[in-house]
Curated annotation (Swiss-Prot):
SUPFAM superfamilies: Ribulose-phoshate binding barrel. This is Imidazole glycerol phosphate synthase subunit HisF. It comes from Methanococcus maripaludis (strain C7 / ATCC BAA-1331). The gene is hisF. Its EC number is 4.3.2.10. IGPS catalyzes the conversion of PRFAR and glutamine to IGP, AICAR and glutamate. The HisF subunit catalyzes the cyclization activity that produces IGP and AICAR from PRFAR using the ammonia provided by the HisH subunit.
Length: 272
């Protein structure tokens, strides 16, 4: 079994790290460079920076933050938010990022996935998927014919892809989209459950497992991490390759090392 990864996520707005619940109610969580240094020292396998205002408010990309972080932190850094072109990829990679995450632009212009992977390599292209459960009230609905339906504790649902920072539904089925981005040349999927995001109630294991089982790409589970048990569940039940978390690290509820120790206790390989 490949080593599982623990990845702190830093949502960045106007140069500061913020955290919210269900993609709203944001509060300040610190300086991105300083937090990155802390997580690096704690043993994080990678870092993810998401400029959460970039796609929606058309903000410039956070090149300065990336440069300052890359000068001091030497683990892989993935950067996303408002990246729309191959030139945007190039600028961020030159600033010191190792991978680029795209979401809205991937949905709007899927050929960007193919183009970027051909130029920079598939390992550089991460497709971020913000996904929400769509519960079924009328099973006879004609529009459900092409959807992948899953049974959950709260009822039957399909999983819908959202864009613009979770503000706009696309009608796209998440399973189908995962398969498509794999075929287009994505190297990894960053999978966020909008329902679980910021709740600390655990990852959406039905969603994570569904995507993991329907693509060969590595899956980063995101949204809902509240403790080490949730991370173990993401790996064991969700079949994720990596687990992303924010709140529990930013507010010092635990360290990366704490999480890794608990994961290792469950006979899941991690790197110290």
């Amino acid at each position: 079994m490949l080593t599982k990864r623990i990845i702190p996520c830093l949502d960045i707005k106007e140069g500061r790290v913020v955290k919210g619940t269900n993609f709203v109610e944001l509060r300040d969580a610190g300086d991105p460079v300083e937090l990155s240094k802390i997580y690096n020292e704690q043993g994080a396998d990678e870092l993810v920076f998401l400029d959460i205002t970039a796609s929606f408010e058309k903000r410039d990309i956070i090149i300065d933050v990336v440069k300052r972080t890359a000068e001091q932190v030497f683990i892989p850094l993935t950067v996303g938010g408002g990246i729309k072109t191959v030139d945007d990829f190039r600028k961020i990679l030159r600033a010191g990022a190792d991978k680029i995450s795209i979401n809205t632009s991937a949905v709007k212009t899927p050929e960007l996935i193919k183009e970027a992977s051909e130029i920079f390599g598939t390992q550089c292209v991460v497709v971020a998927m913000d996904v929400k459960r769509n519960y079924i009230t009328n099973p006879q609905n004609e529009n459900l014919k092409d959807k992948n339906i899953f049974e959950t504790k709260l009822g039957s649902c399909w999983f819908e892809v959202y864009i613009y920072g979770g503000r706009e539904g696309t009608g796209i089925d998440a399973i189908d989209w995962a398969k498509k981005v794999e075929n287009l040349g994505a190297g990894e999927i960053l999978l966020t459950s909008m329902d679980a995001d910021g709740t600390k109630d655990g990852y959406d294991l039905v969603l994570t497992r569904a995507i993991s089982e329907n693509t060969k790409l590595p899956i980063i589970a995101s949204g809902g991490c509240g403790n080490s048990d949730h991370v173990v569940d993401a790996f064991k039940d969700g079949k994720a390759d990596a687990a992303l978390m924010a709140s529990i690290l930013h507010y010092r509820e635990c360290t990366v090392n704490d999480l890794k120790k608990e994961v290792e206790k469950n006979n899941i390989p991690v790197r110290f």
